Amino acid sequence: MGSRIRENDKSELYKPLIPTSITPVISNHSLISIRLFYTAYFAAMGLILPYFPVYLTDLGLNTLWVGVFIGALAATKIIAPPLAGLLLEYRDTNTRTFLLFTAGLATLASALFIPQFDMGWMLTIVIVFGFFWAAILPLTDGLSLVVSEISMMSYGRLRVWGSVGFVFASFLGGLWLVGDNISLFPWILTTLLILTTIAATGFPDLSNIDTKQKQQASAQTNQKALLWLLFIGFCMQASHGAYYGFFSLYMLDAGYSGGEIGLFWVIGVLAEIVLMWYWSKRIQKASPAWVLGICLLLASLRWFGLAITTNIAAIIVLQLLHAASFAAFHLSAVAWVRKFAKPHRQTSAQGWYSSIGFGLGSTVGIMLCGIIVETQGYSAAFYACTFIALLGLLAVWKLQQHFREAA
């Protein structure tokens, strides 16, 4: 997977997409608002990923139905991100206004996760919530990439605040959301989403950056490489199916307490934080074949390790690999989506990356693992995820071929 990248091609990734004549001033208030948004949004995710399955189990669902509900939540990420991107590209829609609208509706839906359980009602609310919740993140990431270019601040150092929020929510959730306290889950979630809506009011207005001006500052595109990159993103996210859907239940079954499970999640995200803070720009400049290939290899080792052992020391070491399987992979992928996509399709390209990876990949992975867990057990699900990560590693070879053609 070695790469030979001409310096002028390599520098295209950081060639400004925004002409200096229309570059707006980004205030400290806007930067603080973006950090607060990421913190609250991912704090909500830090509750949903580890504890929503536990909440559903407490309501009486078996593991198969937990997989259906979590898969339905992930499935909304297939439609919402590209649809939101297309709306912003084809209509004169203000990003900040659209983000406020979607954040407000996601908050309203989360308040309807009421304890009185009715399967049809609950599934409908989960789908509505997931749709608006999924539309928010790729738009915010796109906005943050623009802001990072304008303000010369690393995207990773904006995005890292989401990891901080995830850490606190995962750890505190493990302490609070135990036993009967799991009924507090929907109310804590709603509070965090209210904070995301408040933070979105402080986002900068970038409406003066229009499509033609972006086109004039465009880099050469590579659509075939983009398609392979999207498939690789699908494989990586699908390989997380057992982890995001059933890791907490797996650890409960192995005898760990809620606090210990929360700590396991925290260890993974702490590794993610360190990588994002210190190596964000270096990773984004490196060849995608090298970075994504190494990340997929380490992901396969991570899932294989979880399949064969629940030893506490091994779990701690394996959780450190989250820095590769999520953080390094994400930083590289969003940067190369930006390089390979058509300049006037930047927003929808990020939406498609989110849709195919976090949406379709997560849906397939979680629902497949739900079936495997119900019939074969937790270890078998992690073996399956190992295979999926290795499949993505094979696809990196095709990406490298197209990357060399472009270079």
Regions found by a protein language model. Name each.
Residues 26-74, 226-264, 330:
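Helix-loop boundary and gating motifs at the non-cytosolic
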Residues 184-202, 381-398:
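Symmetry-related core transmembrane helices of the 12-TM Major Facilitator Superfamily/SLC fold
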Residues 39, 109, 119-137, 234, ...:
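Hydrophobic core of transmembrane alpha-helices in multi-pass small-molecule transporters
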